């Protein structure tokens, strides 16, 4: 390829050389084995999905999708997430499979970086979907397996932020906020701009503004009780029976969130658990518990997940569900993944012994060894520098005199 783009890559895409791929494969295998021990079975879905279904149900902004046309002229997209395609799979190919379904995956997802944005357009995700188990046990299982995954990767100082996607909308409904007020508050929370949220709550003022401000910060039992009392008082004063019921639902969800975190903390005392009632996820299909997992040195979440009880219904199979996705390369940026040594036996290909050299290579590979074929030219220089080792037994120069090299050594870019 000629021209200015001969060695360039599209915005958001990058090459993965052998050293990185070896680490990606090792950590992926570790995670998939962990998931298998918890009963999850691996699946795969197409990289291309119809925009009218997956593209719409994923609730990812159209500007962030890669649109294409298939051979019949239908609009398709590179999958922007894995949860929606697996929901389609569970409602179609696996429709007759009894629930619950425990499914795992390791696949890339694609989201188009916007102008001026930095980041990857192709991200490798490794994750699970638990379909057919409701809140409570299902939510705790998702948190347990996600925490186990961070620990298995060696993530330093793992921590989780856990919220409930229904809490903020319920609080807004109980307080009977105006549409403009809701929009300003929701936008601030989506951007994690808590100063803007506080300012918007301050403009509303009074007891309503104070109740909104109580959403911010880590949730403790005392704060949950205070928020519940505040909502009860405001809704009763309004005389709106529906608002009173909504306030009661908020209290129940706050209590369930704290109970869930208490169980998680008891199971993983070395993991930090933080309840955040103002956690607003960026995917609209979440209906309940949502969470993010971090580690020391990670500037962004290593794992994201949550409950999506209505997504499968859009494909015709009603079922509660939850799951999470780990960001493989983001995790590798902060952990060491030691690779087992893999010594290689060098086999020289000399003039007149080509067939014998490959016979020797096949024999050693069949015996479980790793080989490296070295072609020696007439000038005495081999394709690997001619210095991998002297000829050994075999009389035809098949063996490199015990010369062994380990993958991932000096110069391998790690």
Residues covered by each model-derived region:
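TRNA-binding/sensing appendages of the translation machinery
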Residues: 1-84, 140, 161
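Positively charged, Gly/Ser-enriched RNA/tRNA-binding surfaces
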Residues: 2, 20-38, 49-50, 83-96, ...
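Beta-rich nucleic-acid/ligand-interaction surfaces
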Residues: 45-63, 163-173, 279-287, 381-382
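Acidic, His- and aromatic-enriched active-site or binding-groove loops in soluble protein domains
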Residues: 64-72, 177-199
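Short, basic, helix/turn surface patches
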Residues: 67-81, 187, 394-395, 399-401, ...
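Cap/lid and interdomain-hinge subdomains that line or gate substrate/regulatory clefts
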Residues: 134, 138, 161-162, 171, ...
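Hydrophobic mid-domain F-helix/FG-region of cytochrome P450s
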Residues: 145-152, 167-176
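Short, surface-exposed recognition loops or helix-turn segments adjacent to catalytic cores
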Residues: 157-168, 185-186, 274-280
């Amino acid at each position: 390829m000629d021209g200015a783009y001969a060695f360039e890559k599209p915005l958001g895409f990058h090459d993965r050389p052998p050293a990185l791929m070896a680490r990606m494969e090792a950590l992926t295998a570790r995670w998939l084995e962990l998931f298998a021990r918890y009963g999850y079975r691996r699946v795969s879905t197409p990289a291309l999905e119809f925009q009218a279904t997956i593209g719409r149900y994923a609730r990812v902004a159209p500007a962030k999708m890669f649109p294409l046309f298939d051979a019949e002229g239908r609009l398709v997209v590179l999958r922007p997430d894995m949860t929606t395609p697996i929901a389609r799979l569970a409602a179609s190919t696996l429709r007759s499979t009894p629930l619950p379904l425990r499914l795992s995956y390791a696949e890339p997802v694609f989201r188009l970086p916007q102008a001026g944005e930095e980041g990857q357009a192709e991200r490798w995700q490794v994750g699970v979907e638990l379909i057919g188990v409701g809140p409570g046990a299902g939510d705790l299982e998702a948190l347990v397996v996600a925490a186990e995954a961070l620990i298995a990767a060696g993530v330093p100082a793992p921590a989780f932020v856990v919220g409930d996607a229904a809490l903020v909308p319920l609080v807004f409904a109980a307080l009977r906020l105006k549409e403009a007020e809701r929009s300003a508050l929701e936008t601030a929370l989506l951007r994690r701009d808590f100063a803007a949220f506080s300012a918007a709550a301050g403009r509303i003022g009074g007891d309503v503004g104070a109740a909104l401000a109580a959403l911010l910060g880590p949730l403790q039992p005392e704060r949950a009780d205070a928020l519940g009392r505040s909502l009860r008082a405001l809704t009763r004063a309004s005389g709106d029976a529906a608002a009173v019921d909504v306030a009661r639902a908020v209290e129940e969800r706050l209590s369930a969130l704290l109970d869930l975190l208490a169980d998680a903390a008891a199971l993983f005392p070395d993991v930090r658990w933080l309840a955040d009632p103002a956690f607003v996820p960026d995917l609209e299909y979440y209906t309940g518990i949502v969470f993010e997992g971090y580690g020391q040195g990670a500037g962004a979440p290593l794992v994201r997940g949550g409950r999506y009880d209505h997504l499968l219904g859009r494909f015709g199979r009603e079922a509660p569900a939850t799951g999470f996705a780990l960001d493989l390369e983001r995790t590798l940026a902060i952990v060491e993944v030691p690779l087992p040594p893999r010594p290689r036996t060098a086999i020289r290909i000399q003039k007149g012994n080509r067939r014998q050299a490959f016979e020797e290579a096949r024999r050693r590979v069949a015996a479980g060894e790793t080989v490296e074929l070295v072609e020696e030219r007439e000038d005495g220089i081999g394709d690997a520098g001619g210095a991998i080792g002297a000829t050994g037994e075999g009389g035809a120069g098949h063996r490199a005199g015990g010369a062994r090299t380990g993958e991932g050594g000096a110069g391998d870019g790690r």
